[in-house]
Amino acid sequence: GTLVFYTIDGRKTGHSIGASLTQVGERLLELGCQTVLCLDGGGSTNLAVTTPDSTTATIINRPSETGRKVTNQVFLVASDRSSGRLDHFYVNAAGDYVLAGSAVSVTASGVDSNYIPMDASYTLSASAGSIAEQEDGRYLLTTPASGSDITVTASGRGAKGSTVVHAIRNPDNLTLKNGASNLTELTVTPGSKTALTAGAVWNHLPLTATNEAFTWSVSGDIG
């Protein structure tokens, strides 16, 4: 069976609108859950995990309230001793959802049978697009402009591991920014230079995007 810990952040402007118990229940049914237990309904809920490529726990959600001095905790623990036996590879992309044609960084780490990270050589392959090793040892996946669900696989010493990167061809909308502010118009001094960045959103999710995925143009004699 599978155990799911499901956390939804509370109402927080620009980040989350929260969810009712009915909405959470419907979502858990969509995930195939059969038995459900509500552990907390407060804005201070924290979900911390130790990913397979680390030995330190990190909070992965964004609580809508501050922490509490007295709390209840549920821990899932495992042995902290390395077995030294390679079990699989943990593959992680800097973005799971990217704008088609963009490049995204991918890393991989060996994981032993006790889920402790270990050094192990590997090769990376992708089911679509292209992948290349960078000078810093990381890999860069360039997604196809046509869009695709891309499986990136690390393999070595008889072990494997994979992750899926979703390259979205048709985003719901594009944004143009000057710094942190979204732009609909811009007034500048003649002869000046303004740094602009573009972004893409799909299904309310910001897509990881690089400049190569955008085509820039201006209208009128403005530069």
Task: List PLM regions with ranges.
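Gly/Ser/Thr/Pro-rich low-complexity, intrinsically disordered segments
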Residues: G1-T215, S219, G223
